[in-house]
């Protein structure tokens, strides 16, 4: 069977200063799950990155994807010459300061229309304006594809001077009916549930999880099938409804010894979810692949960190058998 997964969001030109002081320059976000999925789907399916990019970035992006024959690049648009550039400085392994240098033109229904036959759309926006709500509505009305959505976008905004800050996801009730699987990290779950001014507050507290059950009930009430909340190196929490009762699962992480770069871990995790749901329609298997891709992403600066299906399955087997 020829599976098709579309990865939707920005392909930013990233300048990354790691927590160890190293500088990495590369194209990020959509590229991580796209290349990871291309390796998992080799010989069995294709991956379609859908993004708006700067004209100057088209050639290097196409060159980046060129070694992977099952990446369909017809969804990379540059007609508006409006892509994303970002500078990221890591304070420690997980926390960073971000500055946005240019903004992407939002993904519209017109951009996704040629790809309505895919099995899954996985949205990985990193800022609140990058995907239009009308785009999700259009897919729901015209496609049978599963919609996986990363809450990084709607919980992040850009100030006039390019500073990237957290925000409360005020209109989430408008979005949730058009999302099948919602993915976020713990910090984003707080920004999605508790209405506060987050612009100057240190949000991250790995022990602050007491809000999750109430938040999950609200999310699932609006039609979302599964809520995944990543808990960094611990693993991920999954919330769903079973017999009208809230079901809470915890899936431990895939352990790694040396973390080189955590940029793109969330995007890679979302890509793993799309693989598990597309091939197995199994929320636990989806978490296994998500944790595996997120862990692999930390292991180096390049895309060679992602492995073949056989190697990835071996990693999953070692962790979860």
List each language-model region with its residue ranges.
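Short amphipathic alpha-helix
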Residues: 31-36
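Conserved N-terminal subdomain of the carbohydrate kinase-like
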Residues: 2-5, 13-24, 39-125, 129-130, ...
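Active-site metal-binding loops of divalent metal-dependent hydrolases
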Residues: 10-11, 268
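Conserved beta-alpha-beta core of the PfkB/ribokinase-like small-molecule kinase fold
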Residues: 125-213, 241
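A short, aliphatic-rich alpha-helical micro-motif
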Residues: 115-116, 173-176, 221
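Conserved phosphate-binding/catalytic region of the ribokinase-like
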Residues: 3, 168, 193-321
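Short, conserved phosphate/pyrophosphate- and ester-handling motifs at nucleotide-, phospho-/glycolipid
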Residues: 37, 185, 266
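Structural motif
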Residues: 6-8, 120-122, 148, 183, ...
């Amino acid at each position: 069977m020829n599976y098709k997964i579309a990865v939707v969001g920005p392909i930013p030109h990233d300048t990354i200063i790691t927590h160890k002081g190293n500088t990495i320059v590369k194209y990020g976000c959509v590229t991580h799950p796209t290349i990871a999925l291309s390796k998992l789907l080799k010989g069995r399916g294709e991956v379609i990155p859908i993004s708006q990019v700067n004209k100057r970035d088209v050639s290097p992006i196409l060159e980046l994807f060129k070694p992977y024959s099952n990446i369909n690049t017809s969804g990379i648009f540059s007609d508006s010459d409006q892509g994303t550039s970002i500078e990221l400085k890591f304070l420690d392994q997980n926390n960073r300061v971000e500055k946005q240098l240019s903004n992407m033109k939002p993904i519209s229904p017109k951009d996704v229309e040629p790809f309505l036959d895919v099995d899954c759309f996985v949205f990985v926006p990193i800022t609140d304006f990058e995907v239009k709500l009308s785009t999700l509505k259009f897919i729901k009305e015209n496609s049978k594809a599963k919609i996986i959505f990363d809450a990084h976008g709607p919980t992040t905004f850009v100030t006039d001077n390019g500073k990237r800050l957290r925000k409360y996801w005020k209109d989430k009730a408008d979005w949730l009916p058009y999302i099948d699987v919602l993915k976020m990290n713990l910090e984003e779950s707080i920004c999605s549930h508790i209405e506060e001014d987050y612009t100057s507050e240190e949000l991250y507290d790995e022990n602050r999880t007491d809000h999750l059950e109430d938040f999950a009930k609200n999310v699932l009430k609006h039609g979302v099938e599964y809520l995944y909340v990543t808990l960094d190196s611990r693993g991920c929490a999954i919330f769903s409804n079973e017999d009208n009762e809230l079901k809470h699962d915890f899936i431990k992480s895939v352990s790694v010894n040396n973390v080189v770069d955590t940029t793109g871990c969330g995007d890679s995790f979302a890509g793993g979810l799309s693989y598990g749901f597309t091939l197995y329609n199994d929320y636990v298997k989806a978490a296994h692949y998500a944790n595996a891709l997120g862990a692999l992403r930390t292991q180096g600066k390049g895309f060679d960190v992602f492995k073949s299906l056989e190697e990835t399955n071996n990693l999953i087997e070692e962790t979860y058998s």
